[in-house]
Amino acid sequence: MDKDFKIIDGELVEYYGNGGDLIIPDGVASIADEAFAENLSLTSVFVPASVSWIGDMAFRCCSNITGFRVDENNEFLCAIDGDLYAKDGTELINYAQGKNDTSFVIHEGVTYIRNVVFKYCENLERVSIPNTVKRIECAAFRGCTKLTRIEIPGSVEELVRWVFAECTALTEVRLNDGTRFIGEGAFASCTNLRDIYIPDSVENIFYDAFWACDKLTIHAHKGSYAEEYAKENNIPFEAIKP
C-alpha cells in the first residue's frame, strides 16, 4: 500500500492511489501542504496516531470526502462529527465537504479556521461561528454558493483576502463590534449581497472588498468610517439609528 504514497523523512508529500477510503500509513509523522489537494476520488480519510501535523490546504477542495477519522491515541488531532480538528479543539483543520449537510455549527472553543476549509462547498446554506473564533484564514468560505446569511462575531478582528468571495447566494452579512478590517476581495463577486451591517470598530476597508456587489447597501452609524467608505466608493448607505 505504501507504493501509493511518496513519503520523505516521515512526511507524506504526494498520493498516487485510486482514492476511496484512504488509510494514511502508520508511521507518517506529517502531511505536506496540498498533499491531496483537489483529489475528487477520496471518500474518507483515516489518520493514524503517528501524525502530529497536517499542512496547509492538505485536503483543499476534496469535495467527495464524507468524513475524517482519527486514531483515538493521536495526541495532536481528532475528528468531531467527521470533521478534522486540533486535539484541543481550538483549530478547525478540515471540513468534510462530501457531506450532504446544509448547516454547520463550528464548535465552541475553536479560535482558528484554516485556509479554504469550506471553499467551494456547495451544500452549506448556514454556518454558525462562535465568538471564540479569532482568525478565519484566506478564502475559507470562498465559493459557498448556497450560503445565504452570515454573522461574524467581533472576536474576528480581520476579514482576510477572499474569505467570502463568490458566495453568490449571500444576501446579508452582519459584523459585530470588535472587527476592525475588511480585506482584499473579502466579499468580491457576492453578486446578490444586498445588506452588510458594519460596526463603528471597523477602521479600514480594502478598496475592492465589495467588487461586483452591485446590489449592496452598507448599513452603519452616521459619521462612521463605513459611511465615508460607502460615499468614496459610490455604494448606497443607510444610517443605523443610534
Regions inferred by a protein language model and the residue ranges of each:
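Structural signature of tandem-repeat unit edges
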Residues: 1-8, 16-30, 39-53, 63-90, ...
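Consensus positions within tandem repeat domains that build extended binding/scaffold surfaces
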Residues: 33-35, 56-58, 93-94, 115-117, ...
